[in-house]
């Protein structure tokens, strides 16, 4: 369910020259691994379910937190209640725990979005990750496990684009969208086709101004 990244190639715009990071020159281990998110989440959930010292309360959400010097009480949307000595807020960029604690954030928008999709291609990717720095932002081609696994015929794309153009691009039909992808992707992997839905995520900087409060930490 994973694909190793053996080499990384970085290029600037249309230049035919590239910077090559070769795993054989750094000890032989992969530079990293690509794991599709749903596989990673399932593995985490199964490990939590098997742990003797963890109680999984899901699906559920925290409706309200009450903190004092003695501990924390969490009221759940299901009506249940949990009490602990410490609450760890690991609930993402729109953290309810952080908001409830009144912890402010510093934010900066890059006026860019990341368009993400999976493509199937004709040729083997050889477990090489490519990153191209284009005027609108980076365009990354990341190797995924093939279908069948040894085929090396699937990659994840992360296409950085200006926010002003993102709605138009996401509104294209599949044929027109792939035509735009090919302009940036090239033809070194042969013919390409979409292998799943497209997603778009805003790109921004955000960090909490404090990481600790009474009986609370952010992770």
Model regions: which residues?
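C-terminal catalytic lobe of FAD-dependent flavoproteins
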Residues: 215-219
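A short, aromatic/hydrophobic, helix- or strand-capping loop or linear motif
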Residues: 1-3, 193
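Conserved FAD-binding catalytic core of PHBH/FMO-like flavoproteins
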Residues: 71-73, 86-203, 207-212
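Conserved N-terminal helical subregion
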Residues: 3-100, 108-113
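A short, N-terminal amphipathic alpha-helix
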Residues: 1, 45-49, 124, 183-184
């Amino acid at each position: 369910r994973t694909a190793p990244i053996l080499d990384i190639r970085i290029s600037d715009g249309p230049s035919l020259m590239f910077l090559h990071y070769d795993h054989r020159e750094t000890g032989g281990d992969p530079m990293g691994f690509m794991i599709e998110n749903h596989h990673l989440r399932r593995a985490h959930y199964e490990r939590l379910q098997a742990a003797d010292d963890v109680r999984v309360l899901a699906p559920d959400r925290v409706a309200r937190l009450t903190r004092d010097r003695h501990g924390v009480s969490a009221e759940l949307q299901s009506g249940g209640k949990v009490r602990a000595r410490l609450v760890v807020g690991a609930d993402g960029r729109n953290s309810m725990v952080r908001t409830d604690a009144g912890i402010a954030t510093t934010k900066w928008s890059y006026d860019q979005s990341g368009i993400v999709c999976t493509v199937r291609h004709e040729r083997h990717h050889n477990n090489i990750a490519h990153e191209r720095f284009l005027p609108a932002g980076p365009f990354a081609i990341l190797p995924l496990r093939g279908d069948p696994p040894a085929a090396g015929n699937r990659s994840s794309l992360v296409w950085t684009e200006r926010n002003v153009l993102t709605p138009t691009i996401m509104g294209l039909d599949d044929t027109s969208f792939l035509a735009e992808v090919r302009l940036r992707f090239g033809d070194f992997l042969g013919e390409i086709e979409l292998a799943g839905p497209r997603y778009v995520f805003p790109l921004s900087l955000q960090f909490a101004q404090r990481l600790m409060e009474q009986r609370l930490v952010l992770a």
